[in-house]
Amino acid sequence: MALYEHVFLARQDITPQQVDGLVEQYKGVIEANGGKVGRVENWGLKSLTYRIKKNRKAHYVLMDIDAPAPAVHEVERQMRINEDILRYMTIAVDKHEEGPSAMMQKRDRDDRPRGEGRGPRDDRGPRPDRGDRDDRPRRPREDRA
């Protein structure tokens, strides 16, 4: 049997319990077709980069699958039909990763010192004083003329 990583996005307006129900439903489909589901990670409700079917957020779920190709095709067919699934992607892998995925690893960006990897202008130093801003002449607004 082949190894796969399968990620799907569910609509934002379903509950986490319904997302778990979807996971159990697709687990059952894979097991009924002779496969096994290993790790299941629920990444939670995350913002989308762009709107998908009028949704700005989605529930993300990762599943590690060890199953024959027909089982994966059946899961994808059922996801295509289900209106709660916005997108899905299945990738064949050589082996499953051990431990949490990259999305589940906590990466704290603020624990780095100030000069490390913050951008191309890190060496600028402090900003100069701009002075009193009320001394600048103001343009009259056109609607007050």
From Swiss-Prot:
GO terms for biological process: translation. One of its GO terms (molecular function) is structural constituent of ribosome. Keywords: Ribonucleoprotein, Ribosomal protein, RNA-binding, rRNA-binding. Residues 94-145 are annotated as: Disordered. It comes from the Bacteria. PANTHER family: MITOCHONDRIAL 28S RIBOSOMAL PROTEIN S6, SMALL RIBOSOMAL SUBUNIT PROTEIN BS6M. Binds together with bS18 to 16S ribosomal RNA. This is Small ribosomal subunit protein bS6. It comes from Sinorhizobium medicae (strain WSM419). The lineage of its organism: Bacteria, Pseudomonadati, Pseudomonadota, Alphaproteobacteria, Hyphomicrobiales.
